[in-house]
Amino acid sequence: YAAIMDAYQNRQDATITFEQLGVDRLYVDEAHFYKNLSFTTKIQGLNATGAEKSTDLLAKIQYLNEITNERGVIFATGTPISNSMAELYTMQRYLRPSRLESQGLYHFDAWASTFGQETTTMEIDPAGKGFRAKTRFARFNNIPELTSMFKEFADVKTAESLKLPVPAYDIEIVKADASAVQKELVDRLAERAKRIRQRNPIKLREGADPSSGKGMDNMLVVIKEGQSAALNPRILDADYEDNPTGKVSLCADNVYDIYQKTTVQKSTQVIFCDQSTPNSKAQYNVYDDLREKLMERGVPKEQIAFIHDYDTPEKKERLFAKVRKGDVRILLGSSDKLGVGTNIQNKLIASH
């Protein structure tokens, strides 16, 4: 507090450092949000590019580890490993770096050569038109030793050991046949992917620079457009005709069917969609389209809500209270905004 007041009074040096705050404990909930920590590797198939927030967290943790002998940071997460085996290395790097250093495993490739194994499998290529051999870091070695190192800093609780009350559920996969437009788009994307592999990509806009790659086609763009086309081609071009048997229409049919069957008990449903979110400048988005389709089928507008419209904790809690009571019966949101800290399960009957 004294450091803050001194800095406030001396406007010429108003910057407060993390050390000056006097922090000696750091609790990080949902710690998997900081899994993208950069590292150097020669292994293919790994995302070694870090996020700025993870680098910032590492700097703070390194300071706390130094002053607390690696006892000042507590992580809480249900998914310490979600997408990549390298995330386990990241957790060790955050919480037990001294152990990595003492074993000569602080650099990722040394850790990977001890605990990991590369495997080669056939998988569908990004364009979705063929297969290719892909080598990935996908299997653990020396598991007893790795487990022992992990348990030095991890207190692991499973759902079975906690005896969490998890309701029974059924999974239904809804199949949507590709439309003629979607098939045509996939063919175009496959051709673009082929040109990219041949180092002859198309220009995405006027003034594109082939030498620097700016404005030129790349696989990330192809994959993103492929995902959009698979959901609804209108994300790419709003002038495409609506498909009554497409994913959005089928979702509306299923949601309305459950809505009708559970009217008496006012059951609620949640719809997750990470693409084509509302409040964008695009002419078309899936959220507005789905709401319009539900309203056309008979769902009142006030019983449909977008989590994106509730941008403060207070607004979200008021929304969640309405969902728990069944006043709002259909809630749409993305995984980031609706997947964590959402207490709406009282009347929840289905998730789409």
PLM features: what roles do these ranges have?
Residues 20, 35, 83-85, 317, ...:
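SF2 helicase motor core recognition
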Residues 29-30:
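Walker B catalytic acidic pair
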Residues 80-87, 273-277:
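Conserved Walker A/P-loop ATP-binding site and its immediately adjacent core
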Residues 164-338:
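Conserved Helicase C-terminal RecA-like lobe
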